[in-house]
Amino acid sequence: ECCTHAHCSQGCRPCC
């Protein structure tokens, strides 16, 4: 998923 990383889970927009 997109929100698997700590820094991504805060802003789940496009997969970072």
Swiss-Prot record:
State which tissues express it: Expressed by the venom duct.
Keywords on record: Amidation, Disulfide bond, Pyrrolidone carboxylic acid, Secreted, Toxin
Q: Which residues carry this modification: Cysteine amide?
A: 16
Q: Give the superkingdom in one word.
A: Eukaryota
Tell me where it resides: Secreted
Please list the disulfide bridges: 2-16, 3-12, 8-15
Its predominant location is secreted
Is Ligase among the key words of this record?
no
Identify a single GO molecular function assigned to this protein: toxin activity
Q: Which residues carry this modification: Pyrrolidone carboxylic acid (Glu)?
A: 1
What would be one Gene Ontology cellular-component term for the protein? extracellular region
Q: Which family does it belong to?
A: Belongs to the conotoxin M superfamily.
Q: According to its record, what is known about the domains?
A: The cysteine framework is III (CC-C-C-CC).
Protein name from the UniProt record? Conotoxin ar3g
